[in-house]
Amino acid sequence: MTTILVSLANLLVVSLLVGAMFGIWLGYNPVNFPPTAYLEQQQHAIRALNVTMPILGKIGTLLTVASAVLARDDRLACALLIAAVVCSLVAGLVTRFRNQPINAKVMTWSVQTMPTNWTTLRDDWWKWHITRTLAGIVGLSLLIVGTLVERR
């Protein structure tokens, strides 16, 4: 029963996290936003997600580690779950060291104080968002397969 509950919580948390990342990728490409719209949208998203998303990432990573430990007698499932942890760590590190420093800068801007290179920072943020989203999608896929093979 423990394995089922950990797997359920793991799949739920990681799916919520990666789903949010995918939704941003799908619906919020800022490339064509005028400066005012970009700033309003980005600052709103940062305020709304900058605490919740990293918490979900940490919980999801810990649950995936727990799932791997519980699957330690099944080499394939354990290996898939460890690979999912690696993807989760990649997404987390990209977020922490690439996206969040840009977020911190954006939060200090007003329309009047946006730097002349704001589009460079916007494009860098977007590139790193795509990177972490792909890592998240691969990680979620590995988690799902690792969970399914473990159940067989």
Predicted regions and their residues:
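Alpha-helical transmembrane segments of polytopic integral membrane proteins
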Residues: W25, N99-Q100
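Interfacial segments of alpha-helical transmembrane regions
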Residues: T2-S15, L63, V69-V90
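Core segments of transmembrane alpha-helices
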Residues: P54-S67, R132-S141
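Mid-bilayer segments of alpha-helical transmembrane spans in multi-pass integral membrane proteins
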Residues: L89-F97
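Interfacial loop at the N-terminal end of multi-pass membrane proteins
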Residues: T3-S7, V13-I59, K105-D123
